[in-house]
A protein has these predicted regions:
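Active-site neighborhood of HAD-like aspartate-dependent phosphohydrolases
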Residues: 1-43, 180-181
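Asp-based, Mg2+/Mn2+-dependent phosphohydrolase catalytic module
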Residues: 1-8, 115-204
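Generic structural signal for small/hydrophobic residues in well-ordered secondary structure
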Residues: 9-12, 54, 102, 110, ...
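Alpha-helical elements of Rossmann-like donor-binding domains used by nucleotide-donor carbohydrate transfer enzymes
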Residues: 22-26, 60, 64, 82, ...
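Short, surface-exposed acidic
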Residues: 31-42, 70-81, 162
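Short amphipathic alpha-helical segments at helix boundaries and their inter-helical linkers
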Residues: 45-60, 86-95, 180
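A metal-dependent, Asp-based hydrolase signature
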Residues: 48-80
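Short, acidic loop-to-helix structural element flanking the phosphoryl-transfer center
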Residues: 75-109, 148
């Protein structure tokens, strides 16, 4: 086996997860809602968990948030802006520089469970399109991790068999599904550890 491609998750890997008070905690306090009441309202936005597979457009989930929380037009704009600030977190500059340095020796990719609007927001902030050759957003392809079909799509777009791909994700179930598909899965715990593991795999 010779590794030809390395793929990364975004949230929790290339982006550090932001604290909840950047978005939901802030708005629960602002609207004066109890935690249970606030969570019950939010559950009505995406009860079938379909945002990540493209079942709700950005316009649709904006409307739903406005309806369940009773937001005015100006409030929903601010709410969504806060959502994207939270969603995009903080860039892990070290890991992102490392990922970019792998090209052109290796094909590089992103596979992210996402919501409509994510490509725009993350490109604006971090310019991923200039750093990675292949970018797969779940809401755009109708498939989400840990569904193994998204890994099949990754390999197809890369033109590389599974056993020649390394994939880094912070969720065990996503890593396990990738491994079961035949990909070399790496559970992200820290930047240093992930870089060391990738280096060991691409050196073999």
């Amino acid at each position: 086996m010779v590794v030809q491609a390395v793929a990364f998750d975004i949230g929790g890997v290339l982006e550090r997860v932001a604290p909840p008070d950047r978005w939901l905690g802030k708005w629960q306090e602002r609207l004066g809602l109890a935690a249970a009441e606030f969570q019950a309202a939010l559950a009505g936005v995406d009860p079938g968990d379909v945002i990540k597979t493209g079942g709700l457009s950005e316009a649709q989930y904006r409307q739903r948030y406005a309806a369940v929380l009773g937001l005015s037009g100006a409030q929903v704009e601010e709410f969504i802006a806060d959502m994207w600030d939270w969603y995009c977190g903080e860039l892990d500059h070290e890991l992102t520089r490392y990922a970019a340095s792998l090209r052109p020796r290796f094909a590089t990719a992103i596979v992210s469970n996402s919501a409509d609007g994510a490509r725009r927001e993350e490109q604006t902030r971090y310019g991923f399109a200039g750093l990675f050759g292949t970018i797969i957003y779940s809401h755009e392809v109708g498939l989400a991790k840990p569904d193994q079909r998204i890994y099949a799509l990754l390999c197809n777009q890369l033109g590389v068999p599974p056993d020649e791909v390394v994939f880094v994700d912070d969720l065990q179930e996503n890593v396990d599904a990738a491994i079961e598909f035949g990909i070399h899965g790496v559970l992200h715990r820290s930047t240093t550890e992930s870089i060391d593991v990738i280096d060991s795999l691409i050196a073999t």
